[in-house]
Curated annotation (Swiss-Prot):
PROSITE patterns: AA_TRNA_LIGASE_II (PS50862)
BP term (GO), one: seryl-tRNA aminoacylation
Protein name, as recorded: Serine--tRNA ligase
Binding site for ATP: R266, R267, E268, E353, I354, S355, S356
GO molecular function, one term: ATP binding
EC number of the protein: 6.1.1.11
Single GO cellular component term: cytoplasm
Domain of life: Bacteria
Length: 426
């Protein structure tokens, strides 16, 4: 959530930075309502001051011995009653204006950082580095992961459609075991890196989704329970970040690192016709998420470390990947800066996103009201929050099924996963 004071004091800069994003955002309605609200507040303050003054005068006169029924006192009381009636009309309108302003600000995305490249879309993202050329598969006849998975009997999409609908999958036998091995391996790596594991609720309330920025803008992307004010989580970022909603943390307890494995649920309303086959874009998928709550002075350094934690998984699995600095036009709603990790999928000859690591600055902290206090100092500040996948499990499995695919149709198991699976080949 953007700061109304920042919008008010730097309207041109704010509008320019919003214009660099993909979308149309206009801060003028906010400025107009803010002007009305502040004028109303000033009027109310003046009237309230007069009401306080009248109360003081009446009290002094009665204390000095003047009869409470004296015409002068009665006139002051009449004026005071009229002011109270006026205030009772002004206060609801002021609250209404504040609520309107808040709703408009909630619809605005975060401001891109100075180190985020300017661009209109993904074609203008900037490649930061490539890793793993020596691990590019030499098999010239690699087939897509969904085909090899079905041939091996470890993936079944047809029966998942029968049970649910399209964009679901059944993992069977060694497929389910491989997924479980990946989850355990990822959690082991991240807890060793200092993250504290959390097993959070998979259903969250509206305030939680608003706090991390999914609501109100992306309601159509989420699954909502029909009879309850609860939503299935699109990512563990939501429940884990909201652990601290409405709290004031001690500065000495920062940074806070959490990792969480959860199923994630997304309607994929805007992706009709894309990635209809395979594990890339599902309504339900598993992911290990990394979340950081940090001091504002360290958040960009923490982002680099977060990316390194996600990269460590890919490097341990020896999966070729690249790191991309997303441009302003491709930046997520709540992020000020994002690095995407894209893994190599040889069947399509493309790198595909497997992790998105973002610094959200104080955007989520303002929405969720997460603050911290320095010992011995007055006042509080908003924390900075970061999140990233460490990693998306289904996409990691897809990358293994393709990059480790052998000419005879078998799949070698990455060495680091063999202790979890008790086998070397699928």
């Amino acid at each position: 959530m953007l700061d109304i004071k920042q919008i008010r004091e730097n309207p041109q800069l704010i509008q320019e930075r919003l214009n660099s994003r993909n979308g149309t955002y206009d801060i003028q309605p906010i400025l107009q309502l803010d002007k009305q609200q502040r004028e109303l507040e000033a009027t109310r303050s003046q009237i309230q001051a007069r009401s306080n003054e009248i109360g003081k005068i009446v009290g002094q006169k009665i204390k000095s011995g003047i009869n409470p029924q004296d015409p002068e006192i009665q006139a002051l009381r009449d004026e005071g009653n009229a002011i109270k009636a006026q205030l009772s009309e002004l206060e609801p309108r002021e609250k209404e204006l504040k609520a309107e302003i808040e709703q408009l600000i909630l619809a605005l995305p975060n401001l891109p950082s100075d180190s985020t490249p300017i661009g209109k879309g993904e074609e203008e993202n900037v490649e930061v580095r490539l890793w793993g050329d020596e691990y590019l598969p030499q098999n010239p006849n690699i087939i897509p992961h969904w085909e090899i998975g079905e041939k091996l009997g470890i993936l079944n999409f047809e029966r998942a459609v029968k049970v649910a609908q399209s964009r679901f999958v059944n993992l069977i036998g060694a497929g389910a075991a491989l997924e479980r091995a990946l989850i355990n391996f990822m959690l082991k790596m991240q807890t060793a890196a200092g993250y504290i594991e959390v097993s959070p609720p998979l259903l969250v309330n509206t305030d939680s989704l608003t706090g991390t920025g999914q609501l109100p803008k992306f309601a159509e992307e989420s699954f909502k329970c029909a009879d309850d004010e609860l939503w299935l989580i699109p990512t563990a970022e939501v429940p884990v970040t909201n652990l601290y909603r409405g709290e004031i943390l001690a500065a000495e307890n920062l940074p806070i690192y959490h990792c969480a494995y959860t199923p994630c649920f997304r309607r994929e309303a805007g992706s009709y016709g894309r990635d209809m086959r395979g594990l890339i874009r599902l309504h339900q998928f598993n992911k290990v998420e990394l979340v950081k709550v940090v001091h504002p002075s360290t958040s960009f350094d923490e982002l680099e470390k977060l990316v390194g934690n996600a990269e460590a998984i890919l490097q341990a699995l020896k999966l070729p990947y690249r790191v991309i600095n997303l441009c302003t036009g491709d930046l997520g709603f709540g992020a000020t800066k994002t690095y995407d990790l894209e893994v190599w999928l040889p069947s399509s000859g493309k790198y595909r996103e497997i992790s998105s690591c973002s610094n959200c600055f104080d955007f989520q902290a303002r929405r969720a009201d997460i603050r911290f206090k320095e010992a011995g100092k007055k006042g509080t500040q908003f924390v900075h929050t970061l999140n990233g996948s460490g990693l998306a499990v289904g996409r990691t499995m897809a990358a293994i099924l393709e990059n480790y695919q052998q000419p005879d149709g078998t799949i070698l198991i990455p060495e680091v996963l063999q202790p979890f699976l008790g086998r070397e080949v699928l």
